[in-house]
Design a protein with these regions (language model features):
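Short histidine-centered beta-strand/loop micro-motifs
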Residues: 89-96, 113, 122, 141-143
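Conserved short histidine dyad/triad with adjacent acidic residue
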Residues: 66-67, 78-96, 137
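Extracellular structured ligand-interaction cores
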Residues: 96-99, 137, 146-149
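Histidine-centered metal-chelating micro-motifs
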Residues: 110, 130, 134-140, 158-160
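Short acidic-glycine-tyrosine-enriched beta hairpin
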Residues: 115-134, 144, 148
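Short, conserved beta-strand element in jelly-roll/cupin
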Residues: 94-115, 153-154
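A hydrophobic/aromatic-rich effector-binding and dimerization subdomain
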Residues: 2-6, 57-72, 76-78, 143-182
């Protein structure tokens, strides 16, 4: 399978993405701010809604606050997992117990990080990526139908082994990775 064939398989919306798109199109304003869970999103949606759209009791996608290695690695021998980010899913903060690389494979997405004093937001254009350390509250929002945002999930131990020589350097990049791992 070549690159174009792979991309073509990733573009069609999955059923739950279609549900999220319907909600987004009813009230895009509700997606402008990051929430913590479905209840927070429903409240935000109600405050900004002019469409009369009625949200369901349950979220159409997973909106848990903590993701562990066990959640993303069904086989404990796996070192890396690649997960396509759900398009149109409400941006919600969640904490990771592993390292994640958010990669804008096609189109754009927004990345949010919760800081100690101020939240940060950045636009990732096609080809951009961000490395997310463990224990960081973060969120991603992909709102373009033909966009593909990829989450590359790495175990802490795998990252340390793969970048061992970089960790031995004495510079700001190695300091960042040391802090991320330990």
């Amino acid at each position: 399978m070549n690159y174009q064939e792979i991309e073509n398989k990733l573009i069609p919306l999955r059923d739950y993405e279609k549900s999220c798109r319907e909600i987004y199109l009813a009230n895009p304003e509700a997606f402008r701010h990051v929430v913590w869970n479905w209840e927070d999103f429903k409240e935000q949606f109600r405050r900004t809604d002019t469409s009369g759209y009625v949200l369901g009791e349950k979220a159409p996608v997973f909106m848990g606050n903590v993701l562990t290695e066990q959640d993303c690695f069904p086989d404990e021998n796996m070192e890396c997992s690649i997960i396509i980010h759900d398009r149109y899913a409400p941006p919600f903060y969640h904490n990771l117990k592993f390292i994640k690389v958010v990669y804008a494979l096609k189109g754009r997405c927004r990345f949010f990080a919760q800081g100690k004093t101020q939240d940060r937001e950045c636009l990732l254009e096609e080809g951009d990526f961000v490395i997310v350390p463990p224990e960081m509250n973060q969120a991603v929002f992909t709102w373009e139908e033909d966009a593909v945002t990829v989450n590359i999930i790495l175990k802490r131990s795998t990252f340390g082994e793969a970048f061992y020589s970089l960790l031995l350097e004495n510079d700001s990049i190695s300091d960042f990775f040391w802090q991320m791992l330990y």
